[in-house]
Amino acid sequence: MNNHIQTAISEQGIEAYLHAQQHKSLLRFLTCGSVDDGKSTLIGRLLHDSQQIYEDQLKALESDSQKLGTTGEKLDLALLVDGLQAEREQGITIDVAYRYFSTAKRKFIISDTPGHEQYTRNMATGASTCDLAIILIDARKGVLDQTRRHSFIASLLGIKQFVVAVNKMDLVEFSQEVFDRISADYREFAKKLNVDTIQIVPVSALDGDNVVNPSDKLAWYQGETLLSLLESADVERELERHPVRLPVQYVNRPNLDFRGFAGTLAAGILRVGDKLAVLPSGKESTVTRIVTFDGDLEYALPGQAITVTFADEIDISRGDLLVDAAKKPQVTQNVLAHIVWMGEESLQPGRVYDVKLATKKTRGQVEVIRHRIEINKLDQLDASELHLNEIGLCEVSLTDPVAFDPYTDIRDTGSFILIDRLTNVTVGAGMIVEGLAAKAVAGQYSEFEIELNALVRKHFPHWQALAIGKE
């Protein structure tokens, strides 16, 4: 326990302290930027200056800074976050590192994502659950290709709030001219992104200027500190305003007298008495109970794990989607999606993969790669395949009808993963843009050939046979 927490508990009492912590709003954010822009140092500074470091951690940090530090006599705060041995030895971030801290106003979960292009898939993983992105820019270098790449990926993954931290201002003598030039360059580029708010702040993570506390060296800057921007960022309950979406995780039948359908509410506010539809079947019924471990609820909010019962006996199974009967999503076997490719082997159109969308498991294939996105310049390039860490806009066909929402509306029902059928490794992550009309099967193959092809791909996936028609 650190001194800050110990003081708060002694003043408030343990129960009051825990109650206050439980009811604070939560902001999930990620830090991203070019290599050596100071992402891990910035997080370390946030933890240090907000008094979130325990005494034993501080002692270990002092020792590690002497052995592995890259900051001379100063504490190397990046070592608080860079946990892998390879990261510490190279002074870079490889894995996605998660950290938790809180202030008097809010709780935070941080994703520290790698800056190198070969770890794009790691960054996509970190960004997929975040509400806000901190884009770091080295004041000496300005807006780089990697800055554009990280900004685009964060935007693609649905993050609508950006805080641009122009770091290492101490190395440009805290120049307002440099800051204004970088701000103008970034705002011009950001016109291409789907972002609601962009705030730009000058900082020095190494010395702590304008991170948690204001700095006299940046007297010309009249805005808030970085931490103040994070504390005041808008964390709207966006999902509560959407229609009800409840992916069925499993059928809960502990005895002959009870049959409920369990899952985590993805969107909307679900109330007893609501009329829901089951997709893809389309059957409808009324909710009679919302059951949880702690007892029945009158209503449930997004993120809650619940079990619902219905007034009618209807066929519902794992993978179905329970939705507001008056506001149903689209059901289709064909979607247009951005795919981030994570596999060592390239994505080949026509190759069949296992597909998982929310709780639904099916099979599918990429029919066409419309274009590959050159993520440094945002150019759209022709492509016949996608390689590791590449992103493309693809037409995907599935063997079963699926209900979905566009990813920009509801992440949980608008995203999917592609799984290699032989190795069971996740090789791709998809964000659905829209549904597509079904295409007619080409006539150059006989019905027997199409069925034989489907049989081979089902029972001999290691042959990596390409699809020639619908299954």
Curated annotation (Swiss-Prot):
Pfam families: GTP-eEF1A_C (PF22594), GTP_EFTU (PF00009)
GO molecular function, one term: GTPase activity
Region named G5: 204-206
Region (G2): 91-95
CDD domains, alphabetized: CysN_ATPS, CysN_NodQ_II, CysN_NoDQ_III
tr-type G domain residues: 24-240
Residues that coordinate or bind GTP: 33-40, 112-116, 167-170
Record-listed E.C. numbers: 2.7.7.4
Region (G1): 33-40
GO biological process: hydrogen sulfide biosynthetic process; sulfate assimilation
InterPro entries noted in UniProt: CysN_GTP-bd (IPR041757), CysN_II (IPR044138), CysN_NoDQ_III (IPR044139), G_TR_CS (IPR031157), GTP-eEF1A_C (IPR054696), P-loop_NTPase (IPR027417), Small_GTP-bd (IPR005225), SO4_adenylTrfase_lsu (IPR011779)
Subunit (UniProt): Heterodimer composed of CysD, the smaller subunit, and CysN.
Function according to Swiss-Prot or TrEMBL: With CysD forms the ATP sulfurylase (ATPS) that catalyzes the adenylation of sulfate producing adenosine 5'-phosphosulfate (APS) and diphosphate, the first enzymatic step in sulfur assimilation pathway. APS synthesis involves the formation of a high-energy phosphoric-sulfuric acid anhydride bond driven by GTP hydrolysis by CysN coupled to ATP hydrolysis by CysD.
UniProt similarity note: Belongs to the TRAFAC class translation factor GTPase superfamily. Classic translation factor GTPase family. CysN/NodQ subfamily.
Protein name per Swiss-Prot or TrEMBL: Sulfate adenylyltransferase subunit 1
Species this protein is from: Aeromonas salmonicida (strain A449)
Gene responsible for this protein: cysN
